[in-house]
Amino acid sequence: MILRLTPAARGDLRAIFREGVRLFGEQQARRYLEQLGKELRFVGDFPQAVRLRDEFYRPVRVHRFNAHIIIFDIVGDEVVVARIRHGHEDWKAD
């Protein structure tokens, strides 16, 4: 499947990196983003491994990675990552 990040998800990645640099330093922020990239590849390769959450307005799949969650859907032959949010945020409102 093709992995596609929405503009909002790309913005989330930039924000995660900036916040990581501020809190933990650039080297650690880069490592975290590399690990997050591996999780995104997993989601792209095995999207069906993540349970569909149908309790929301629109059913989505939610995959946890450390402090963050990857919110995505399968659309045709694409895995579309809508957002990458911190697990403590009110991400259900978006």
Residue ranges and their predicted role:
Residues M1-R31:
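Arg/Lys-rich, positively charged N-terminal/basic patches that mediate binding to nucleic acids
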